[in-house]
Amino acid sequence: MRILCTNDDGIYAPGLEIIEQIAKDLSDDVWVVAPEHDQSGVSHSLTLNDPLRLRQIGPRHFAVKGTPTDCVIMGSRYILADKAPDLVLSGVNRGRNLAEDVVYSGTVAGALEGTMLGLPSFALSQEFSMETGDRPVWETARTFAPQILRRVIEIGIPKNTVVNVNFPACAPEDVAGVLVTRMGKRNLGFLKIDERRDGRGNPYFWIGFEKADDADTPASGSDLAAIAGQCVSVTPLRLDRTDEAFAAILTAKLK
């Protein structure tokens, strides 16, 4: 099995080393094609107005000056043009990709691109807490991912479906279980604009985040609830975002 690994945190991110280790538990034919620089939050963007720069940094290791989407296309259609990958793994992201995160996430987008290209794909993310800070417990993802991937691959991923896996911010021995979940929803009040001033007094801005009022009470069965309960969350996501129920209403009313 040929595996293509990518991420959005960049070619030198610790999580990329973890996902390569996970991939090597499944196969000895593992290739890494990741962004030259951090691409967190770029979503499913595609580079069209600038050239892509490709740099080989080691055996089967390549850096692309582009997005995770660019990396998956470059990996599958150019670097591995002789024999396409059988599996795409994107991650392991530093931080969770739950609920609305999946819309912004370059990690999830890398897996979505793999799915669009007809390749079974997973996005993997490791939550971290205030206690762990800059030191996510990578061993949790490292411990649980191989067995989850093997089982899902054995079952078979439906066409046009990507599997989003999130690992809780706790040691492997403290994980409460593995749950199949649905995409959750947050109170979007967590987004804010942080205004500051530079040395000349000119304003500049950061998009910031703050805890929402309902952050501690996620809906039962959601990815948010699973992670809050120290469980691994496995969420199948579909490429087809059609709202079938509303489409039926529109069909009846727009005649």
From Swiss-Prot:
<dbReference type="Pfam" id="PF01975">
    <property type="entry name" value="SurE"/>
</dbReference>
<keyword id="KW-0963">Cytoplasm</keyword>
<feature type="binding site">
    <location>
        <position position="40"/>
    </location>
    <ligand>
        <name>a divalent metal cation</name>
    </ligand>
</feature>
<protein>
    <recommendedName>
        <fullName>5'-nucleotidase SurE</fullName>
        <ecNumber>3.1.3.5</ecNumber>
    </recommendedName>
</protein>
<dbReference type="GO" id="GO:0008254">
    <property type="term" value="F:3'-nucleotidase activity"/>
</dbReference>
<dbReference type="InterPro" id="IPR002828">
    <property type="entry name" value="SurE-like_Pase/nucleotidase"/>
</dbReference>
<feature type="binding site">
    <location>
        <position position="8"/>
    </location>
    <ligand>
        <name>a divalent metal cation</name>
    </ligand>
</feature>
<keyword id="KW-0547">Nucleotide-binding</keyword>
<dbReference type="GO" id="GO:0008253">
    <property type="term" value="F:5'-nucleotidase activity"/>
</dbReference>
<feature type="binding site">
    <location>
        <position position="9"/>
    </location>
    <ligand>
        <name>a divalent metal cation</name>
    </ligand>
</feature>
<dbReference type="InterPro" id="IPR030048">
    <property type="entry name" value="SurE"/>
</dbReference>
<comment type="function">
    <text>Nucleotidase that shows phosphatase activity on nucleoside 5'-monophosphates.</text>
</comment>
<feature type="binding site">
    <location>
        <position position="93"/>
    </location>
    <ligand>
        <name>a divalent metal cation</name>
    </ligand>
</feature>
<keyword id="KW-0378">Hydrolase</keyword>
<dbReference type="InterPro" id="IPR036523">
    <property type="entry name" value="SurE-like_sf"/>
</dbReference>
<comment type="similarity">
    <text>Belongs to the SurE nucleotidase family.</text>
</comment>
<dbReference type="GO" id="GO:0005737">
    <property type="term" value="C:cytoplasm"/>
</dbReference>
<dbReference type="GO" id="GO:0000166">
    <property type="term" value="F:nucleotide binding"/>
</dbReference>
<dbReference type="GO" id="GO:0004309">
    <property type="term" value="F:exopolyphosphatase activity"/>
</dbReference>
<dbReference type="GO" id="GO:0046872">
    <property type="term" value="F:metal ion binding"/>
</dbReference>
<keyword id="KW-0479">Metal-binding</keyword>
